[in-house]
Amino acid sequence: MQTRATHPPLSLAWTIWGFGATFYLMGFFQRVAPAVMTAELMQEFNLNATALGNLSAFYFYSYVSMQIPTGILADIWGPRRLLTAGAFLAAVGALLFAMAPTIFWAYLGRFLIGGAVAVAFVGNLKLASEWFPARYFAMVSGAALFFGIVGAVFAGTPLRILVVAFGWRNTMLASAAVTFMICAGVWVIVRDYPGEKGYADFTDAAATRGNNSRQRIFAGIVEVLRYPNTWLLFVIPGGLVGCVLTFGGLWGVPYLSTHHNLPTTQAAALNSALLVAWAIGGPIFGGLSDRIGRRKPIYFFGYTLAVIGWSIILFIPNLPIFLLAALLVITGFASGCIIISFAFAKESVPANLAGTVNGVINMGVISGPTLLQPAVGWMLDRYWTGALLQGVRVYDLAAYRAGFLLMLVWALLSLILLFFTRETRCTQLS
């Protein structure tokens, strides 16, 4: 008979965690889905670039606002209830978006999706901290990013093929149905702690459950903000995530189609290559950081490589297609270094605040695309020359460069801020 003195086998830990990660996959799918249906959405709702940027960013508006509450709820409710509720509301939001008669309802659907899937990543980090030994945390965090990017890849060329074949509304309806099934799976399979399955917990579960007092909630927020690494790691990852998700999640496909003369499906494939490389880079950078016992040097190397890559991709003209593809892969891979932020921040505060600090950091991570997607859209409209193609606005190279400059500035400033972080040497603050 299994005793509580034995920790759960890794196979069970991966299974429990995997159901939560599947929800994160679907959340990432919804996050970047507008990138391959920009023309359909602009035509359906009569949108300019600013309005399209806002439609995509409505996901991020609610996503960002939910990050600190999500971190707190992960500590208080536990990941099972949190992920189940999130998956249910995300399915409702996808249904609303797919059936939207006007742009208002499309905005509302995207807003609901973003707020609902906001729980996915932090919930998965909570599962990782409870079901795996501490030495696995950065690698499992990177694996979560991998799952997310798999969702983004499905939202590339495969989604484009489905949109062409069945229309964007029917395709989004199908995604809502899949999300309802994920909701059911999480509720049936996932458990908060190994102790609920008869195994020994890796953490002091009683201490991490806490209570629902208002004083505890606000004290947790105030406490994590006392540590300088929290502030720095709030800002730093948003620079690269803003580049990846503003380009790969919205403006990359129309840019590559217009200025590299690629068919939409090929542009979507290059976009997917960027995101796949990002997915692969996350667990590799996280695992390498764990292996050498340092956070800062690996993070700095990856960040520097990514900034150089984005500078070339966005501002050097007439790149051969094979070189452009190689640069997108290298830059996406290097951008995976941002996953180190979560282990870095977790080690910088007391262990009982892990959920709260990861919520704060994830809020900073997603603030990049939240601000940059509509900002780049605004710059595109500001520099628009009046060109139209089948009733949809077309933007010239100068307009794209003006918008993309915003992305690069944030990334460069974040690279500078990385110098000021305090190394944890992969050791949890006691």
Residues of each region from the PLM?
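Juxtamembrane intracellular "pre-TM" segments in multi-pass secondary transporters
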Residues: 2-9, 193-234
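C-terminal ends and interior cores of transmembrane alpha-helices
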Residues: 88-101, 304-318
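Cytoplasmic helix-loop-helix junction between adjacent transmembrane helices
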Residues: 109-148
